A protein has these predicted regions:
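Hydrophobic small-molecule pocket/channel-lining residues, especially in calycin-type beta-barrels
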Residues: 1-132
Length: 132
C-alpha cells in the first residue's frame, strides 16, 4: 500500500473547468482555479487527519477522522456535510451540500503521485499531483 500522508504539488489537470461549471462556480473563480497550482498536504496524527490545500490566493484546512461526518466550507462557498473513507490506496471524500451541488473526490496514491478524480453531476476531472 502506498503512503498517503505527504505533500503534493499539482502537475497536470484535465477537464477541471467543466467540473467547476457543473458545481456552479462562477467564471472569475473558475479562471483563478485554472491558473493556480495548489499544494496539498495530508497529515495523519494517529487517525486525526488534516487536509491542507495552499494556493497563491488562499489556504484551506479540513480536519477529519475516517468515517465521521464533518462540516466543510468549500473554496466556492458551499457548506457541506463531508465524509472521508479509505479503500486500499484510495482516499474518498463525499461532500453532501446543504445548498448547491454535491461532489465526490477520489484520491489514489502511488509512491510518486496522488491522482485525484473530482465528480459532480456526471462530469469528471482528473488532476495529477507529484509527491514532494
Amino acid at each position: 500500500m502506498a503512503p498517503i500522508a505527504g505533500k503534493y504539488v499539482l502537475e497536470s489537470s484535465e477537464n477541471f473547468d467543466e467540473f467547476m461549471k457543473a458545481l456552479g462556480v462562477g467564471m472569475m473563480l473558475r479562471k483563478l482555479g485554472q491558473t493556480s497550482k495548489p499544494t496539498v498536504e495530508l497529515i495523519d496524527n494517529n487517525g486525526e487527519w488534516n487536509l491542507k490545500t495552499t494556493t497563491t490566493l488562499k489556504t484551506t484546512e479540513l480536519k477529519f477522522k475516517l468515517g465521521q461526518e464533518v462540516d466543510e466550507s468549500t473554496f466556492d462557498g458551499r457548506d457541506c456535510k463531508t465524509v472521508f473513507t479509505l479503500e486500499g490506496d484510495k482516499l474518498i471524500q463525499v461532500q453532501n451540500a446543504t445548498k448547491g451541488k454535491s461532489a465526490k473526490y477520489t484520491r489514489e496514491f502511488t509512491d510518486s503521485q496522488m491522482i485525484m478524480l473530482s465528480e459532480c453531476d456526471g462530469v469528471v476531472s482528473k488532476r495529477i499531483y507529484k509527491r514532494q
